């Protein structure tokens, strides 16, 4: 096993390591509700485009 094969060689089928943001591929702060699968930073950026409205 070379150096390239060691990292990320374990299968990721479930859990936090298996899911990533659809916009930036980040794995932290993921919003999965309603099937968004987008991290919270990208959600703040794209919320209006998706259709979320900020209420006063």
From Swiss-Prot:
InterPro entries membership: Ribosomal_uS14, Ribosomal_uS14_CS, RIbosomal_uS14_euk_arc, Ribosomal_uS14_sf
Necessary cofactors: Zn(2+)
Tagged with keyword Metal-binding: yes
Keyword Nucleus on entry: no
Cofactor note as given: Binds 1 zinc ion per subunit.
Cell compartments where the protein resides: Cytoplasm, Cytosol; Cytoplasm; Rough endoplasmic reticulum
Keywords of the record: Cytoplasm, Endoplasmic reticulum, Metal-binding, Ribonucleoprotein, Ribosomal protein, Zinc
A GO term for molecular function: structural constituent of ribosome
Pfam families: Ribosomal_S14
Gene Ontology biological-process entries: cytoplasmic translation
Residues holding Zn(2+): 21, 24, 39, 42
Lineage top rank: taxon: Eukaryota
GO terms under cellular component: cytosolic small ribosomal subunit; ribosome; rough endoplasmic reticulum
NCBIfam families attached to this UniProt entry: PRK05766.1
Family to which the UniProt record says this protein belongs: Belongs to the universal ribosomal protein uS14 family.
Assembly notes: Component of the 40S small ribosomal subunit.
UniProt-recorded name of the protein: Small ribosomal subunit protein uS14
Lineage: Eukaryota, Metazoa, Ecdysozoa, Arthropoda, Hexapoda
């Amino acid at each position: 096993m070379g150096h390239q094969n060691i990292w990320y060689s374990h299968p990721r089928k479930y859990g936090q390591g298996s899911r990533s943001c659809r916009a930036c591929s980040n794995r932290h702060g993921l919003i999965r509700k309603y099937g968004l699968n987008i991290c919270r930073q990208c959600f703040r950026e794209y919320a209006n485009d998706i259709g979320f409205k900020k209420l006063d």
